[in-house]
Regions:
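Acidic, Ser/Thr-rich low-complexity intrinsically disordered segments
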Residues: 199-241
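C-terminal non-catalytic accessory extensions
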Residues: 229-308
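A structural motif corresponding to the C-terminal lobe/cap of the Radical SAM core domain
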Residues: 2-212, 221, 289-308
Length: 308
């Protein structure tokens, strides 16, 4: 397939790395995915929401439940095969979620090879939305105190509030253990030999040479700062092994080295979040922001900023 004149990104050595959001229907548009690769899109955020089909139907996320298009996993892998990394957005707390969801989500994330790109959150009912109205009318909304205690204003249907809160913490821990996280990144970037579209060309052919040298410098900066800054011996040792592992497996391609160094650094961020979740004293009724849904945390911060 031809696409006319050579894209501006290619002519200038791909100076812009792009990302976007899309529905999983993207997997069915071959031409669009090819064009995204040529335009230097690196990643796409996809609202998977849940591996539980009943929850997807409940939320009218019907494009995620289309057997003729393939399973969710098959469609994620199809997008990845077009040199686009998929960031999966996942939510727990739907009416059809029971305790099994806390094992199902980490398994889906692993099978999807979603690396660091798995964003797991608690369902939160935003005021004035149909969900908020329905929950309010059915008496399934937490009050302010309970929202702070459980991290969300949603009262689950098939489990207790404590089970939802503790199950969410458990799912986060499972998803971001060292072995789980790096198992996913290894599966994608080493086992599958994942390459972003510009790497299909000779990296050192003009005008990519300047970009390649810059990526080497950035890789060295990220890797050295990471190994100096991380104080926990177990984390630092694993990060060092991962850096050597990618060097041995993928050689000296500057872009892939930089991306993988960033992936390793991002694990440190998730490790801090899961550590905060594990250390939270759930008996005192005060939840850290890491345990709250994003909208809930923003609401609390906004309230605290208002002068008394």
């Amino acid at each position: 397939m031809t696409f006319g004149r050579r894209p501006r990104q290619q002519e200038r050595g791909f100076p812009l790395a792009l990302c976007t959001e899309a529905t999983v229907d993207l997997a069915e548009d071959e031409e669009l995915m090819q064009l995204m690769g040529l335009a230097n899109f690196w990643s796409v955020f996809v609202g998977i929401e849940s591996p539980n089909e009943a929850s997807l139907i409940e939320t009218k996320k019907l494009q995620n439940v289309r057997p003729k298009a393939g399973t969710l996993l098959e469609r994620v892998h199809r997008i990845q095969s077009h040199v686009l990394e998929v960031w999966c957005g996942m939510i727990v707390g739907f009416d059809h979620d029971d305790r099994a969801i806390f094992d199902a989500i980490p398994k889906f994330v692993d099978d999807a090879r979603s690396g660091n790109a798995a964003l797991i959150g608690l369902l939160h009912a935003i005021p004035t939305t149909p969900l908020h109205v329905r929950l309010k009318e059915s008496g399934k909304l937490n009050d302010e105190e309970a929202s702070n205690r459980y991290g969300t204003n949603v009262v689950p249907l098939l489990m207790s509030r404590e089970e939802l809160r503790d199950g969410f913490v458990d799912a986060m821990r499972k998803a971001y253990t060292l072995d789980a996280y790096f198992g996913r990144t290894d599966a994608l970037f080493i086992g599958d030999g994942f390459r972003f579209a510009p790497q299909q060309r000779d990296y050192w052919a003009p005008p990519l040479a300047k970009r390649g040298a810059g990526d080497y410098l950035k890789f060295l900066a990220v890797a050295s700062r990471l190994l100096i800054s991380v104080k926990e011996p177990a984390l630092r040792s694993r990060y060092r092994r991962q850096l050597w592992r990618i060097l041995r497996a993928r050689g000296l391609g500057p872009q892939i080295l930089l991306i993988c160094a960033i992936k390793i650094a991002m694990h440190y961020h998730y490790a801090a979040i899961t550590k905060a979740l594990g250390e939270a004293d759930r008996a005192d009724g005060v939840m850290p922001d890491a345990m709250r849904s994003f909208s809930r945390a923003e609401h609390v911060r906004a309230a605290e900023a208002v002068p008394s």
